[in-house]
């Protein structure tokens, strides 16, 4: 069981998949967001920032530096 609603869980899965796509396939934020079902790049960026604590570009730069 999780403390998340089904909608929150689905959103978390989509954002994690978008993050994986950006890291492993080199997609930009707009393309990754679109691939996981976001139609609006600004909505994707807003929800990504809430989930990971930074916008996609800054989060990915930080992750790549730590590899």
Model-derived features: where do they sit?
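Alpha-helical DNA-recognition elements
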Residues: 1, 50-51
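Short hydrophobic/aromatic patch on the recognition helix
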Residues: 43-44, 48
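DNA/chromatin major-groove-contacting recognition/catalytic segments
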Residues: 58
